[in-house]
Amino acid sequence: MKLAYTLIVVLISIMMKLDSRMFGRLNFERPLLTCTICGLLLGNLQVGLAVGAQMELATLGMMSIGASGIDMNMGSLVGCAICIMSGANIETAITIAVPMTLLSTIIETCADVIRIQFTHMIDAAVEREDFKKAKRIDIVYGPSLYVICTIIPVFLSVYFGADLVQSIASVIPAWVTDGVTLGANLSLIHI
């Protein structure tokens, strides 16, 4: 049953990640909606709504302007799922969401470096007039990277639990977290 629940959460996370990138803007990236869907599918709608509302408030307080903001949504989803699956209280979901958000931000920052290379690959394909390849890179490679950067951390953290998230977050050097914070802050002032 744990594996089935984990796979459900992974599918929700894929929908959440591809929402604004492929499906338009259906607001699947909002913790209130994501956690509510998680609660509904995992059999505890009340906890899903409560965690979603708490995380939505936290997200509104940390909303950034620009492309380098934090991904509180993945942390919210993981926290909600672990809370429902373990029967823990709502405060536990928030406690799990913070390190998961940090891990998610670091993973996305690294993925951004790879996505920049995709842009160069598209430019090179267009210069060679290989438009099919340029289209394939844009439509397949980018979303595939988003999905990979989502399913691996979500699956591992939900399946193995909060202890894994906490232990990984505690090993991250301070210079990495400081760099991520600096990058997010620079985007706020448009540098």
Segments from the language model and where they lie:
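Hydrophobic transmembrane alpha-helices
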Residues: M1-M74
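Alpha-helical transmembrane segments in multi-pass membrane proteins
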Residues: I8-I12, P31, C35, G39, ...
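Alpha-helical transmembrane segments of multi-pass membrane proteins
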Residues: D178-S187
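Generic secondary-structure signature for well-ordered alpha-helical cores
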Residues: M16-S20, V47, C83, G87, ...
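Hydrophobic, small-residue-rich transmembrane alpha-helices and their short perimembrane loops
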Residues: A53, L57-M121
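Helix-loop-helix junctions within the multi-pass membrane cores of secondary transporters/permeases
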Residues: I94-G179
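Conserved small/polar residues in nucleotide/adenosyl-binding loops
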Residues: I189-I191
